Amino acid sequence: MTMQRLCATLFRAIPALTLVLAAGAASADPIYWTDWIGADTDPGPGFIGHGNITTPTATVNVTYTNAAGIGFYQSSGGIDYWTPRTPGTNSPYTSAQVDNPPTGTDIIALRYAGDQTLTFSQSIVNPVFAFVSLNGNGYAFLNQDFEILSFGAGLGAAAPGNHSCGYWGCGTVSKQVVDLGGGNIEYRLIGTGEPHGAIRFTGTFDSLTWRSMTSEYWNGFTVGVQNTANEANPPTGVPLPATWLLMVAGGAGLLASRRGRKTSL
């Protein structure tokens, strides 16, 4: 194959390769959910739970603290409150951004109004927060906006609620934005009925704090991530696939130009 034919072949391949790369970037990624460990037999005041998130290249230690206490802590076996799981596209926890519902049966069930915090041993990116049975309750996040990805209001409901109902039934959620003054804004996730679903926070996090707005036994949650901060923003030095594509195209163009100048002499 001559150099000119090689260059022409590469240029013809660029549109197809670009579409492949774009499709890959637009698709949902698997979520790596927290594996809650241990069995704290005292869910009362001062509760602390521990877990791990294992991604392809890292293990993130997760610590959950709640001064008021919780309803119960399920870290091994027990009822699977994250059903229905099949088909996956109908799950109240999956969406265009989330491929898979929470893994296993692990869940932290909440009971009391008040603040609680998740702390991560290394920075994570765009955490996904899955919730069960947020009926007659709400979660309030101070100065931390979120996106409602999905919830189970029934397959015929409007998006993003067009998913199967959860373990305890159907429901809806909405976001309320409340200006508290002094530069503080509270973003509230409000449930009606028996909502089960998932929300996502955008950005890099070492911790996440929220407030249960009312006491109610019980509503539950877990948390997962697509990437750690290091995975989402790898050290420079290794070109990404799109970068390689541009390098090949540029090199081919340069060679073609030089070849053309040679033959014209």
Locate the predicted segments by residue.
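C-terminal membrane-anchoring or membrane-association module
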Residues: 255-265
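Terminal, low-complexity interaction segments
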Residues: 152-235
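Extended extracellular/luminal ectodomain segments enriched in beta-structured repeat modules
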Residues: 121-128
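N-terminal secretory signal peptides that target proteins for export/translocation
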Residues: 1-9, 263-265
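A short, hydrophobic C-terminal helix/tail in secreted or cell-surface proteins
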Residues: 239-257
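N-terminal targeting leaders for non-cytosolic proteins
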Residues: 29-112, 147-186
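Short beta-strands within extracellular/lumenal beta-sheet-rich domains
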Residues: 104-121, 136-142, 195-197
